[in-house]
Amino acid sequence: YKYVEKYPALYSEIKERCVPSKERAQNTVAIKLRMLQAFYTELEDRDEIDVSPFRKLGKNRRKVVMKESYDAPVYLLQEEFLKVMNTDVPATLQEAKEAFLLQCAFGSRIDDFKSLNMDKVVVSAEGIPYLRYLPQKTLKSNEHKDEVEIPIIRYALDIIKKWQFNFPILKYVTGKSGYNVKIRKLLEYCQIDREVKVFDKDSSDNIYKPLYTMGSSKLCRKTHLDMLTKVQVNMYVSGHHKEGSSAVKHYSSLMLKDRFILMCAAYKQPIYKVDKQLNVIEE
């Protein structure tokens, strides 16, 4: 980011939101460097260059600059999630609230979430609505192009029918008034202020921040996975599932109906059915 003012011509054709304005996180730097290293290694293998510049770094230096580290995952507890769901918010936060709740229901990465549309909604023979899509991040390594199938719980259906996945706020995820900022404002308004631990590289020590300051689209996926993991454990411990049954295996290995029941329990939602037009069938 220090080179933006020094060499403005390099950034003249780049969209403003893509121009670096602050120091990148170490993990981001490490990932980009690994990509560059792979590129130069291939050039070296093809004899297009004599030697990769990464060889000049030395083993120890390369290890340092490419090191990735991750804090303990930050997510909403079930009671915190339900608090957000049940809190009336100002009109300025309503769209962000509903987009956030919907993304938490699916646990989708932000790029996948932004690309969703009504064509991705399917109804099973049992009347269970679910979302079906190909995750973009793993598309290249997904040899058989296996799709993700996520049951749609009751509150998520209402949001989908209202917005049809057309959330204007998702046009800008980052930025001063983007989706991530609105998520933080939403969580602050709902008083989601539990202290969470974050490692500060400048002081080389842990610092503690209110959870709402850590709000972003990434929080949705982590919240989704934590809620499902905990409800599986709770159902097993309480005797609802026998040891070795499919219900205590990894979530993704369960049948659609099992996953639907599990998700309804995790999010405190009623079990329901719909017709092919997504109308709820009263029983």
Regions inferred by a protein language model and the residue ranges of each:
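Short, polar N-cap/turn motifs at the start of nucleic acid-interacting alpha helices
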Residues: 120-128, 214, 230-252, 274-279
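Short, basic (Lys/Arg/His-rich) helix/loop patches that form interaction surfaces
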Residues: 167, 184-236, 240-244
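N-terminal DNA-binding recognition helix of tyrosine site-specific recombinases/integrases
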Residues: 13-56, 111, 185-186
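C-terminal secondary-structure termini that scaffold catalytic or DNA-interacting sites
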Residues: 192, 245-246, 258-283
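Short, charged phosphate-coordinating catalytic segments
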Residues: 41-52, 101-127
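Catalytic-site neighborhood detector that most strongly recognizes the C-terminal catalytic loop/helix
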Residues: 137-139, 238-266
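Conserved tyrosine-mediated DNA breakage-rejoining catalytic core shared by Y-recombinases
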Residues: 116-159
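Long, amphipathic, Lys/Arg-enriched alpha-helical "connector/arm" segment
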Residues: 3-21, 64-94
